[in-house]
């Protein structure tokens, strides 16, 4: 248990907070009305909460379309004419938070609130570093929100490289991000770099190169 006086996030959730979320909807046949309804219902039920972790979301998307566990609805990767497509959509940059940045104390010296990569100040069993820093060159002794973003960006870059090497077609979309904001511009660049090359379109700025499958959606 944490030391007496350690602050916790306020709200109605108890120790099981975030552990009772709705399971991911598996691949669903949308060639029939029932399948379409199932997907739309799942989308309508989604609610945003907490920080932004793009690599975690993309990783689960990859798992859903794969033919292996924990999801088994995907066709075999070796099947001809079978494209594995993952669409990565986000409205912000990767974020991970120190307790103090959210108004909490950190008497347990966890260095971050608990999220998908665990605590930033605790080594996960079997790892030489806290999981958020594992397999990156990012400093594992800089416990700041900005450094956590760098670590997540590094995780995202590695994931994108591995996904495309495995044959996934990666489409990326940012929502209302601004190139004039340095943090948002960095996320836009990361998303563009993650996206696959178009098989048909050319880069409007250089016709010798394929266009990237990245879009920044703007407007209300």
Residue ranges of predicted features:
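P/S/T/G-enriched low-complexity
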Residues: 1-220
